[in-house]
């Protein structure tokens, strides 16, 4: 019985020891499972250096902000644009000197002389000599072109004389080419104005200080008598006096027309252009390039 109890106690001790060993083994097996999540916790604890690494680039951002000031320094380039705007402003005043140069290069008298040179009728002397009857007709009071102050009413031609001069003028005007009629009529009126100036109807500017009142009145009376006593042979006499006409042309090249003479020239020209074509039943084409702009001062065309 004692042996049985001993064996029973041994068995109990063995079973308890085995149970303890099993529990220890089980606990040993469970502890590594519990210890395995600990390293991730340590890894999570190691994340602060990562946060520190994240914090380290953050201080590097000021370096980017420090690099931005040079970009802000590029803004002075925009501030450098005002000098460009300042350069544009001096360009505009540079245009004004060009306009001033145009005004300085062409004084008023030179501009008028250029206009006159462009509008002086270019007509052959033979054509003007051919239209000499028209010139004599226009100089007398039998035409509306003649002015009252040039001739007295008592010296007016008779209607028969005017009719004869009218026929001669129309015959010569019809023989001139149509394209040359306008310039020829304008040249005749121009020569009449200059002839009046030479004969003393209008005093030239250069001769005003030298002439006296009595000399002017005598020259006007002589010219009125010459124009009032014109005969039908006057055109033929003038046709044969070419040397005298050349001398008159040389003398009158230095004469100048005054502004009131220019207005008188335009008025007489417009009347003649309305009278002669209707009177002679001829076509006189008008050119706007010469009719719209008046004559200037300082012309040098002689009377034919």
Swiss-Prot record:
SMART domains: AAI
Gene3D superfamilies: Plant lipid-transfer and hydrophobic proteins (1.10.110.10)
Residue ranges, compositional bias (Low complexity): 41-92
Keyword terms, alphabetized: Repeat, Seed storage protein, Signal, Storage protein
Keyword match Iron: no
One Gene Ontology MF term: nutrient reservoir activity
Signal sequence annotation: 1-23
Region ranges (Disordered): 32-92
SUPFAM superfamilies: Bifunctional inhibitor/lipid-transfer protein/seed storage 2S albumin
Repeat among keywords: yes
Family: Belongs to the gliadin/glutenin family.
Its job: Gliadin is the major seed storage protein in wheat.
Miscellaneous comment in the UniProt entry for this protein: The gamma-gliadins can be divided into 3 homology classes. Sequence divergence between the classes is due to single-base substitutions and to duplications or deletions within or near direct repeats.
Protein name according to UniProt: Gamma-gliadin B-I
Organism of origin: Triticum aestivum
